[in-house]
């Protein structure tokens, strides 16, 4: 790879049961790269201002040790990737972390990728993004990029839906069909869609529209002012989208229509070991961070 990347992920302590799947998908995307031009960033947040740990079933120190064990294999890959981890005790949200991540690495790398604990990163991620950046960096050094997503709840998301998903029906509360927003997909299932791709289907999405999971932005766009406003605590992707439209409304958003990124929003283990939250039927009803 000729392009330098950074990919960053905030892990809340109660997400410890799902982050391994994200790490496995990330490892898969790195195993066959020719060099180690990827910085892998993690912040493991142990702050309990919003959610308290149920110490009758888990201890915070144990979760920290588990996280360190999960991340360790990334440091031992043949290419010896630059893995940067920290344990955070202060109050932060995803907006705080992503704002810092974009600002911190925009002067060190060419392209930034937003990871997420409930995401599965396509194994083609860095290969296709490297190809894209090398082709467009002279003519459009400031750009956004996105991957195909599952079937969404209204037609405003159709430009982002994966080609195999977009013509499927949206069924409210559906957890059984593979295209559904509530379906929890495995890495192997994701690979079945992506491994069959022979020719990339790339379009320019206008106006900009994206969610934060797997969102890609060139460092030149960040350095020009596209970042999450400091007054934003949640809904960071919407805020970042507004800033992109305000600051650089004409930059392209290159969208890979036939490369699937998985966002397991309703993963059954997304919120574990939280005091007083033993039976959460609908995650977002009680989600605070």
Question: Positions of the model-derived regions?
Answer:
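Short beta-strand/loop segment that forms part of the nucleotide-sugar
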Residues: 36-51, 86-88
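Conserved catalytic core of nucleotide-sugar-dependent glycosyltransferases
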Residues: 122-224
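Short beta-strand-to-loop acidic/aromatic patch adjacent to the donor-nucleotide binding site
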Residues: 108-120
């Amino acid at each position: 790879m000729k392009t330098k990347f950074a990919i960053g992920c905030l892990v809340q302590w109660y997400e410890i049961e799902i982050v391994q799947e994200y790490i496995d998908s990330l490892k898969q995307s790195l195993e066959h790269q020719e060099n180690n031009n990827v910085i892998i960033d993690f912040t493991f947040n142990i702050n309990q201002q919003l959610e308290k740990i149920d110490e009758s079933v888990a201890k915070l120190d144990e979760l920290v040790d588990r996280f360190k064990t999960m991340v360790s294999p990334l440091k031992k890959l043949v290419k010896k990737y630059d893995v940067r981890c920290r344990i955070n005790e202060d109050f932060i949200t995803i907006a705080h972390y992503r704002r810092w991540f974009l600002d911190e690495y925009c002067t060190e790398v060419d392209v930034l990728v937003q990871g997420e604990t409930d995401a599965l990163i396509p194994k083609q991620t860095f290969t296709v993004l490297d190809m894209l950046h090398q082709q467009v960096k002279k003519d459009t050094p400031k750009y956004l990029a996105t991957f195909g997503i599952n079937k969404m709840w209204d037609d405003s998301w159709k430009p982002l839906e994966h080609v195999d998903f977009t013509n499927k029906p949206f069924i409210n509360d559906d957890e059984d069909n593979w295209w559904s927003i509530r379906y929890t997909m495995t890495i192997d299932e994701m690979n079945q869609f992506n491994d069959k791709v022979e020719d990339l289907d790339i379009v320019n999405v206008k106006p900009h529209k994206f969610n934060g999971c797997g969102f890609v932005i060139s460092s030149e766009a960040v350095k020009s002012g596209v970042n999450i406003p400091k007054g934003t605590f949640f809904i960071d992707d919407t805020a970042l989208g507004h800033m992109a439209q305000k600051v650089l409304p004409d930059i392209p958003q290159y969208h890979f229509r036939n490369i699937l990124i998985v966002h397991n929003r309703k993963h059954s283990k997304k919120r574990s070991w939280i005091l007083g939250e033993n039976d959460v039927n609908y995650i977002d009803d009680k989600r605070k961070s």
